[in-house]
Amino acid sequence: MPNTKPRIVITMGDPTGVGPEIIAATLAEPEVRQCCRFLVVGDSAAMARGITVAGAALRVERTDTLNWEESKEGVLPLWEISSLTEADMQYGCPTVASGDAMYRAICEAARLCLEGNADAMATAPISKEALNRAGHRYPGHTELLAELAGAERVVMMLAGFRLRVTLVTIHEALADVPRLVTFERVLETIRITHRDLHRYFRRNPRIAVLALNPHCGEGGMFGDEEARIIAPAVAAARQEGIDAIGPLSADTLFHFAVQGAYDAVVCMYHDQGLIPLKLLHFDDGVNVTLGLPIIRTSVDHGTAYDLAGTGRASAESMKAAILMAAEMARVKGSGGGTP
């Protein structure tokens, strides 16, 4: 019988951070090895060092063919895209070479997915500074992947088993948020959230849409974005058959969301969504890029230079990202989620 386990390609992230070691720790776990077939895109020296730091019973095996065989016991299959020197891999000291290696790993993984040679990609954390020093001017994974995939609008979703949040604005100064919360952005965020939750998680997702201001603006006393922008966007989404409700006050909504009343919460700005998400899922939260033609999940943390090489970095978010990518690929392959 053909092997139907999802094919997950994993990028090594910043070789001077915790990426290689949390990947090694994750891929040594039977639960992960049994749920999917996997291939790491990265540097063999960096991954071998990561295996040692993690104390994983694995060895790197380089490959240049995509046969997607069942992963051999004790083997970490690697698609090599760089040959970093020891100087390029000093912990906490990203270089131009390491920044270029991160970029090439992301591009190669995206290419494999876009060409149908992998079912999903899961990414380890990168250094945005090193990426830019290497001449690749992107704020992060999301913007680079959107360009590679030709996606006009993407949405960041942070997810755990108790809560999913999506963001209308992401890395913006709080003072700029009211100007950036537009009817078009709110409606498009609701649409993409609905479409991809339908595609990868549930057939009929129920979506809560948060207010921007305290108490939904209190009838205009604390701002009018709710009446002028958010409520019309929710009404337009409902006209399209989307089960969206809002605007709702953020100070009470999350109490009901974590009890399962909603499948996702659309938030107006970064901290409005990430504070409750990280309160619940600090170790095992997953970053998912919605709006792409491919599945991309990632850890919900950074390079953690202070922990790199110590063996103390938690691999729970990396594990959750790979497991979620595999589950999303399975649901997509079966034609959609279940009600």
From Swiss-Prot:
Pfam families: PdxA (PF04166). Binds 1 divalent metal cation per subunit. Can use ions such as Zn(2+), Mg(2+) or Co(2+). A divalent metal cation binds at H171, H215, H270. It is found in: Cytoplasm. It comes from the Bacteria. One of its GO terms (cellular component) is cytoplasm. Its EC number is 1.1.1.262. One of its GO terms (biological process) is pyridoxine biosynthetic process. GO terms for molecular function: 4-hydroxythreonine-4-phosphate dehydrogenase activity; metal ion binding; NAD binding. It catalyses: 4-(phosphooxy)-L-threonine + NAD(+) = 3-amino-2-oxopropyl phosphate + CO2 + NADH. Keywords: Cobalt, Cytoplasm, Magnesium, Metal-binding, NAD, NADP, Oxidoreductase, Pyridoxine biosynthesis, Zinc. The active site is located at the dimer interface. Belongs to the PdxA family. Homodimer. Catalyzes the NAD(P)-dependent oxidation of 4-(phosphooxy)-L-threonine (HTP) into 2-amino-3-oxo-4-(phosphooxy)butyric acid which spontaneously decarboxylates to form 3-amino-2-oxopropyl phosphate (AHAP). PANTHER family: 4-HYDROXYTHREONINE-4-PHOSPHATE DEHYDROGENASE, D-THREONATE 4-PHOSPHATE DEHYDROGENASE. This is 4-hydroxythreonine-4-phosphate dehydrogenase. It comes from Geobacter metallireducens (strain ATCC 53774 / DSM 7210 / GS-15). The gene is pdxA.
